[in-house]
Amino acid sequence: MYCTGDLKNRHRKLHVKSRIYLAGVLGLVSATAQAQSGDEVTVQSGRLAQKQFDAPASVRVIEGDAIRNAGVQVNLSEALAQVPGVVALNRNNYAQDVQISIRGFGSRSAFGLRGIRLITDGIPATTPDGQGQSSTVSLTSADRIEVLTGPLAQLYGNSAGGVIQTWTREAGEQPQLDLSTTFGSYGLRRHDVQFSGRTGSVGIVADYSTFEIDGYRKNSAAERKQFNGVLTSQLQPDTKLKLVANLFDMPMAQDPLGLTADQLKADPRQAGNRAELDRTRKSVQQNQLGAVLLHQFSPSLEMQWRLYGGTRSNLQYQAKTFFNPSSWVDLQRDYVGLGGQLKGKESNLKFGSMDWILGFDLDQSSERRNGGETSSGEKIATLSTSKVYRDELSKARNTDAFMQMNWHWVDAAGHNPFTITSGLRYSRVQLDSVNYNPASGDNGIGNLNSTAASPVLGVTWHTTDQLNLYANWGRGFETPTLAEAAYSVADSLNSVVPKFNQALTASKSQHSEIGAKWTPSSGQRLNASLFKISTENEIVTALSDSGKTAYVNAAQTLRQGAELGWNSMWSEHWKSLFSMAWLDATYDSKFDTKKTSGGVSVADKSIPAGNRMPGIPQRQMYASLQWAEQGFAPKALGFSASADWVSRSAMWASDMNDAVSRVAGYDVVNLRARHRSQWGTVRLEAWAGVDNLTNRQYVGSVIVNQSASTPQYFEPGLPRNWMTGIKLSVPL
């Protein structure tokens, strides 16, 4: 616990650390550099495409080969480990998905994504209220992943603590069939069939994959089937259409729940309290179709339209707790969205040129929520005996408009010393819930409406061809999701009940960042940034209990951090990656969670100012050394190998920062070996890997603010485990 004086001293020390770090970065990048052109990779910097080297933001790109080399291509956490500022924790619990946070946004999530926008092939994969599921991304057909952090992410609207965009690979000129199979520890099986080809102006990529695992822990088996198809057609020389179909079917994912510290120590492979008895599990099915139409009026003016829609069903069985019976929740969601944008370039301005974009997003989801009690893991469906207690219809919709301008200032000598970026997004988000079960009274009734203007401003100083310095600032907001508003803390202590949480409000945040991008020589690239984020009414976990989680608004939070990324190509055969992130995420002022006693609202627990936000390690490091016999080109043959190191510092699972919720830091080493060969036109690729080479025992993820009566915070990481696979590529 920190007193006011301690907190001031602590912040003063953080500011000193920031100055020292910045001085080191500027000293490093001011060293003599060899003449070298900047990074030519084009990324989405805010809403406008821009060279990665020139963008006034932290933008990282993971190419297709890196995605495939990272693991079995099942979880986004495999590839995202290398991105500074992104904490991707594998729960090894496929019922709840991986836990991903960007600069601390998303760490509160009990399942799926929160605080992060997910976009696949130009189609939003995040609902209007801010929910997303990373498991629906098809990694077996992914060509590229981009991660945008910092102020410019606010141009994507609600819950844009960061933006993750993925793209399916383009079809080649020659039809090709790819067959792959992967096996691993604990009964892991993944099989994939992919067809790609092009006929005239029409190209298609169709990918179907299956995944099964018996699970490391008891009650942790899972099964998935997934199809991802992208059809592109050049309708006219200046008009292109992309159709996207994504089908995701997870008929069964058992939920082992978390473990207490004593359970973790006794046997990390066991399931949590009553998980086996109540057969805790989840089934999910999602079908989505989308279309993106791009028309170019001229080389300097283009228009884009996007339309999508889909359905999602989610059936979950939850365990009995001390206060609540075992239960089930059935969610049936329909969603639809429309967006448009006009993008242009003005080249004949007096002082340079300008890129600009204007656009809008309209999205809506409708979710029918039913719930009731279970017996031995099966529904008790008798309404007259109050065994079915939820029948609600919840809707989320957003109406957004946005704009962005990049002004490339050119001086009298024809040089471009500065690029100034400005943007604004106006958002209106509405959440409504109505109740159709008279027995539950007004428990399912409520609404939350939020409006916000999110301005951003940034500048890049092109000091040399090898060095760019940038600074940016922005404001953002985040609404509660429908799932977060669906539960409240009960009148009694340590209990979560199915009641719409009318007390939740949207959080408001202010982001600032400075950074440097340096390419000292061919094959060397260094990115460094410092940032500060202040948030009011941050949405945090009040209480979590066996799959049911209630949330509350904290008064103020503060995030201060530094990120460093260094990519090096040492020779044709050797390269390395290194990233480091330091994040101090704290409650900047004291706040209380509430309960009701005798009809009066009283304090439940008091969180002191200075306590660290749970689920966020203060330090994270990643290093990878890679070797390739015949170089790193995507089609290079021969042997290749890599050794990766991931290190994370300690973190807390409770905002009380008590000893029982502290998780020790850890280091793990992963190895990969691969061989590619070719006979005629047929290519064969075989690979093998070992994760956690040293067999380190560690906690892979935490469930934030579990009930004090059953503090099942911990989800164990895997011990040493192996995987091996083979892929056959046959031109047709």
Regions found by a protein language model. Give the residues of each.
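N-terminal periplasmic accessory domains that precede
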Residues: 76-79, 99-103, 116-120, 133-135, ...
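Short acidic/polar hinge/loop motifs at secondary-structure boundaries
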Residues: 107, 116, 123-149
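Signature of Gram-negative outer-membrane beta-barrel scaffolds
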Residues: 353, 357-464
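Membrane-embedded beta-barrel scaffold of Gram-negative outer-membrane proteins
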Residues: 294-296, 302-318, 462, 468-474, ...
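Surface-exposed extracellular loop regions of Gram-negative outer-membrane beta-barrel proteins
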Residues: 251-264, 364-373, 379-380, 428-437, ...
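Gram-negative outer-membrane beta-barrel transporters
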Residues: 343-348, 409, 420, 525-534, ...
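Transmembrane beta-barrel wall of Gram-negative outer-membrane proteins
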Residues: 176, 183-212, 217-255, 280-299, ...
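Conserved C-terminal beta-signal and adjacent last beta-strands/turns
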Residues: 21, 122, 234, 246, ...
